[in-house]
Amino acid sequence: MLTAGLLLAAGAGRRMGGPKALLRDGNGWPFLERAVSALLDGGCDAVTVVLGAAADRARDLLDETLRADDPAVSVVEAPDWDEGMGASLRAGLDALASTSDHDAALVTLVDLPDVDASVVRRVLAAGTGPDSLVRAAYDGRPGHPVLIGREHWDGVRATARGDQGARAYFSDHPPVDCECGDLATGRDVDRPEDLTP
């Protein structure tokens, strides 16, 4: 199954005090690079990064890590990124639908520092093709990444609004949960105090 990683990194990060796409971990490694690496190392054939707030600075980070020249990595800007995650998801799926022949998109968020390649591999392994709808769960709590087969892209794009992402679509088309709590917490980083030293 040919799968594209879709990294949503467009938000302003108001509670964080700035865009999460610009964050670095305690070792100076950019969250953007960490997430792109997790997707590629975990088995995605390519990665589309969706930017919005501070897009130019985020592109500079990709340049710094040499990802800007990586043919497996592309960038799309969500013009209406400030409407929430739904806008970023629509922009990313629109880009994939018009430029790729991937069977599925594995959607993740930039602010999940402990979601690594092992989680990506496990969720990808649970997919079966263009009809797949699988999401990571952490001790039973739904999270990201979420594998969305191509057959679901139109439905997700039609219902993705605000900060709910694909939730409305999932209420009518429940995804298969793929337990990953033994690999990661899946917790996001929302505030400066959430960053581990």
Model-derived features with residue positions:
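Phosphate- and divalent-cation-binding pockets in alpha/beta enzyme and binding domains
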Residues: R57-D60, G155, D188
